[in-house]
Design a protein with these regions (language model features):
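N-terminal catalytic or cofactor-binding beta/alpha core of small enzyme domains
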Residues: 1-333
Length: 333
């Protein structure tokens, strides 16, 4: 079911949805200053696009189908390819790592989250969603690693980031981008990424990077520690709602646990390089996405929506006084 049709419950297509090339990327404009990005939940694997391999390549040929082609069932004979491997070391480039693992159920969580947010506030977040499987294109990497030379994948990549830029332009004043992901780390905590590495958080050294919430820090005259693990940090609010999170007052740093600091989307579209729109990456553990079943997933998505409402009220001048308290959900995780 198309995302906007899910939100409205209407059988007829809704006119304000915007689609990229062959419908691989979907943008549903909202009417508030929150953007939800879901880059790794797609399932489409069109056979006319090459899979992303474990090593980046300098060039790759792709047969691009005509507009209107059945991209799900297309049967296209591809030309022989000549692939050239990059030989220089990429070990120090964190963006160069090639992963093709999908973040399952992140789209489903986003649907419930957005619907709950709108029901609570009367305002709908902007949504940008990639329907391609990550084995075809990864919006959370620089284009050379996202597409590996595939021209169609490069076009889809540009669609994704252009839609985020369009959503940001539609925000008047400060705003927030939430980039939704999934991870399978053993600690089963929600990992909240502001671009600080695990080492920086462990050492409480916040001077080595400009965070993706720099606008928030400037506007409210806060120190990084306040927004990372203060009582009214996003991690603090998630913990109060019953969900283990890092960083948070309970766990201000990851220690030896694995931790994702925020990727290309957070770096590119947050306020680390200026602007009023911040970005935060949320890495959701497998137990909340699928291991404990659909009821836990749905409850979590609703609770996350209410936490975001509270966070937006606190830091982004949102008047959502009719919102139901997160504590009324009674969630524990």
């Amino acid at each position: 079911m198309p995302f906007l049709q899910f939100l409205t419950g209407e059988d007829e297509p809704v006119s304000d949805v915007k689609l990229g090339i062959h419908g691989f990327v979907e943008y549903i404009p909202g009417n508030t200053n929150l953007v939800i990005s879901v880059p790794h939940g797609g399932e489409m694997r069109p056979p006319f696009m090459d899979d992303r391999d474990k090593k980046p390549k300098t060039t790759r040929n792709t047969v691009v189908p005509p507009p209107g082609a059945d991209v799900k069932n297309a049967n296209v004979n591809k030309d022989d390819e000549s692939l050239v491997l990059i030989t220089e070391s990429l070990e120090d480039d964190t963006h160069s790592k090639i992963s093709v693992v999908a973040d399952i159920f992140t789209q489903e969580i986003a649907k419930i989250l957005v619907k709950e947010y709108e029901e609570c506030t009367g305002r709908r977040p902007h949504v940008v969603m990639d329907h391609l499987h990550r084995c075809k294109m990864d919006p959370n990497r620089p284009i050379q690693y996202a597409a590996l030379g595939d021209k169609l994948a490069e076009g889809v990549f540009k669609n994704y980031h252009n839609f985020i830029s369009e959503a940001k332009k539609n925000i008047d004043g400060p705003g927030l981008l939430i980039d939704l992901h999934g991870q399978n780390h053993h600690q089963n905590s929600i990992e909240i990424g502001y671009l600080y590495t695990r080492g920086m958080l462990n050492q409480e050294d916040y001077s080595l990077v400009t965070p993706s919430v720099s606008s928030l820090l400037r506007r409210h005259q806060l120190q990084p520690a306040d927004i990372l693990h203060g009582d009214e940090s996003l991690g603090g609010m998630m913990e109060e709602a019953g969900y283990r999170s890092c960083p948070s007052p309970r766990q201000p740093s990851p220690g030896e646990d694995k931790y994702y600091k925020g990727g290309y989307i957070t770096q590119t579209h947050g306020s680390s390089s200026g602007g009023e729109v911040d970005a935060i990456q949320l890495e959701l553990p497998s137990e909340l996405r699928h291991e404990r079943g659909p009821e836990v997933r749905e409850r979590f998505a609703r609770d996350l929506a209410r936490v975001l409402v509270r966070f937006m009220q606190k830091y982004y001048a949102c008047d959502n006084s009719n919102v139901i308290s997160v504590s009324e959900t009674g969630s524990t995780t």
